[in-house]
Regions:
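Metal-dependent amide/peptide-bond hydrolase catalytic core
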Residues: 235-405
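Phosphate/diphosphate-binding glycine-rich loops and adjacent basic-rich segments that engage nucleotide
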Residues: 185, 194-227, 231-237
Length: 405
């Protein structure tokens, strides 16, 4: 079975994660895909495949003869999707021989256009997979799962010698909780790769330092006709807080190694308001400055409007794995060589986000990230090509070959 055929099957399984439940996994939907994957792994000969109570799927492939004592290499992808644009089942749409131009996404009224996504012109002639425009596609990260499964099938059909291989599919990556209950010992790998990137040939070992900030505002609500010098409008103080952050430090205005504050939720009225942000920066020093900036604004506004008007809670999420991967750069060198074997330009880029691998690296499992061939994740314009997925599979297999050469 081809990788894209698996993807078409997986995206039809509803698996959004949720920040609201406080459970692990955050949604029971994810077990539906986990059980399907366990069954498929067993059919592919991964005899010990199982899913645990927290919805982590594990499996192991024995070494070929003579390679039993070699280091163990792992591959990881995540089963959950974002909850945005995911209120009903995905309907994947295949467009053979894509012409590189505007493409209407079903009857949604949305158009996938090179004006918005310039790389689309480079996909001309490929077989493009999208949703119908009413949901995400779910290639993030079901494409990674499909590619790992196809790699396993290919290993069964060819003679690539290899040491022990370890496979894992995780829940709740999209809410930053993928490694929360990851059993490093059970997984067993010395090194691993996540398949959770974008363009095929992408190799990533630098990610954001990340934190979440919740800012709450307590107002004083009195009748507006008699409120002079008395009312404190929590909603207006919230607006004031946001206006004091650097106006150009938003996701829309930044790229590459530039960090940002991202306001993703606003709720409020006169009595109470709340702003929720994510804070991101590749540079640890600048990351700390961003957190201090929010603390300083909180102090200023409390001095202006009264003690207790503004409260700030910052929660650390993950760190830049570069400091770990720098000690085992052979992982990057092998991935780079694997791309070159197929005349695919290796794209070494910083991750403007995080992956399970970032946290796993700090848990003792160095784990850079590889591209799956997908683009425009987390929204209705998400897309991937059959050819890009095929290349990602070949690169993964070549990494295995080079790792044990």
């Amino acid at each position: 079975m081809k990788a894209y055929e698996r993807l078409l099957s997986y995206v039809k399984v509803f698996t959004p994660s949720s920040e609201e439940t406080g459970t692990s996994p955050s949604t029971q939907y994810q077990f539906d895909l986990a059980r399907l994957l366990v069954q498929e792994l067993k059919e592919l000969g991964v005899k010990d495949a199982d899913v645990d109570e927290h919805c982590y799927v594990y499996g192991h492939i024995p070494a070929t003869r003579g390679y039993e004592s070699r280091q163990k290499l792992g591959f990881i992808a995540h089963m959950d999707t974002v909850s945005d644009f995911c209120d009903h089942l995905v309907t994947p749409v295949i467009t053979p021989n894509y012409d590189g131009k505007d493409l209407a996404l079903g009857t949604s009224g949305r158009v996938l256009s090179p004006k918005m996504f310039p790389h689309l012109s480079t996909l001309k002639g490929r077989t493009l997979i999208t949703s119908d425009g009413t949901t995400i596609l779910g290639a993030d990260d079901k494409a990674g799962i499909a590619e790992i499964m196809t790699m396993i099938e290919s290993l069964n059909d060819n003679t690539i010698p290899h040491g022990p291989l370890c496979i894992a599919f995780t829940p709740d990556e999209e809410i930053g909780m993928g490694p929360a209950h990851f059993d490093i010992k059970k997984f067993g790998a010395d090194f691993a790769y996540t398949l959770d990137g974008d363009t095929e040939g992408e190799i990533q070992y630098e990610n954001f330092n990340a934190a979440r900030a919740v800012v709450e505002f307590t107002g004083v609500n009195v009748h507006p006709g008699s409120s002079k010098n008395t009312m404190v409008n929590a909603a207006l103080v919230a607006m004031e807080f946001n206006s004091m952050l650097p106006s150009a430090d938003t996701p829309r205005d930044t790229e590459d190694y530039e960090g940002f504050f991202h306001l993703y939720s606003i709720k409020g009225d006169v009595s109470h308001a709340a702003l929720e942000y994510i804070i991101r920066d590749h540079n640890a020093t600048t990351f700390d400055v961003r957190k201090k900036t929010m603390k300083h604004i909180t102090k200023i506004l409390n001095e202006k409007w009264g003690k207790g008007t503004v409260s700030l809670t910052i929660t650390e999420q993950y760190r830049n794995m570069k400091e770990i991967i720098d000690t085992c750069m052979e992982l990057i060198e092998r991935a780079t060589a694997a791309c070159k074997e197929y005349n695919i330009p290796p794209l070494i880029t910083p991750i403007r986000g995080g992956t399970d691998g970032a946290q796993l690296s700090f848990m003792g499992l160095p784990c850079p990230n590889l591209g799956t061939g997908g683009h425009a994740y987390h929204g209705p314009y998400e897309h991937i090509t059959v050819e890009g997925m095929n290349i990602a599979v070949e690169v993964g297999l070549k990494i295995i070959e080079l790792f044990y050469k």
